[in-house]
Swiss-Prot record:
A biological process from GO: negative regulation of catalytic activity
Main location: cytoplasm
Source species: Homo sapiens
Signal peptide: none
Tissue: Expressed in heart, brain and lung. Present in endothelial cells (at protein level).
Homology family: Belongs to the NOSIP family.
Motif Nuclear localization signal: positions: 78-101
CDD domains (alphabetical): RING-Ubox1_NOSIP, RING-Ubox2_NOSIP
Protein's recorded name: Nitric oxide synthase-interacting protein
Upper taxonomic lineage: Eukaryota, Metazoa, Chordata, Craniata, Vertebrata
Job of this protein: E3 ubiquitin-protein ligase that is essential for proper development of the forebrain, the eye, and the face. Catalyzes monoubiquitination of serine/threonine-protein phosphatase 2A (PP2A) catalytic subunit PPP2CA/PPP2CB. Negatively regulates nitric oxide production by inducing NOS1 and NOS3 translocation to actin cytoskeleton and inhibiting their enzymatic activity.
Amino acid sequence: MTRHGKNCTAGAVYTYHEKKKDTAASGYGTQNIRLSRDAVKDFDCCCLSLQPCHDPVVTPDGYLYEREAILEYILHQKKEIARQMKAYEKQRGTRREEQKELQRAASQDHVRGFLEKESAIVSRPLNPFTAKALSGTSPDDVQPGPSVGPPSKDKDKVLPSFWIPSLTPEAKATKLEKPSRTVTCPMSGKPLRMSDLTPVHFTPLDSSVDRVGLITRSERYVCAVTRDSLSNATPCAVLRPSGAVVTLECVEKLIRKDMVDPVTGDKLTDRDIIVLQRGGTGFAGSGVKLQAEKSRPVMQA
């Protein structure tokens, strides 16, 4: 309620609209927004460049990428992993040298203490007729017992004086974790290899129109079997052997009966039918999540 008094016609009630506006301006709390059609990509656009694909490939999870964009992403991730691994190995070697130096210093302190004790030993003649020798103990050998009185001031907790140069806390380097060598998909987060990418061949609506002319149209491609137009409102699937794009209705009614690729004639398995991830139409009934969240720090009392 930091800006309640600064709003126009401020009243005694903190309204929902004021709360949402203050949350957006404060920088705290999780923000939710409902995505509109303008924020949803088309089904034939790359998930990285958000532009219509010229040489599309699809992952086993159904995410469509431009071949050049995804290969550049994989190459960049491999370089980043190599850089992180080099920094990790360097820090690991530095820590190993520090541990060896500490062990060497501890060993030297142990030897130095032993030599000091050896040089401080004084041999005294023992009189066998004294009571000390008969008892086998000396007053110097008696160890003090545990104290039952109040604790002394010397044993009180000593807080470090950080303003003294000798007691200034030392800033230590952040410990690096061993990076994973696996390249992950930028959308699903699952492991991704170049061999997992399947080429996709869209069937254009009009084969006489070039690629530039197709981009300006709202309906650009059709199903390779039924010739139905493809859009974000039409669930699609990619057949792995041929790379053809067909509708899910065609898959359920025609292809699953014989499990044969209608383009190449190859046998199909469930793994060969890749459901294409589409952006949706902007309506809630499209079956696509249209709610975006941004997590920010939470201010608690």
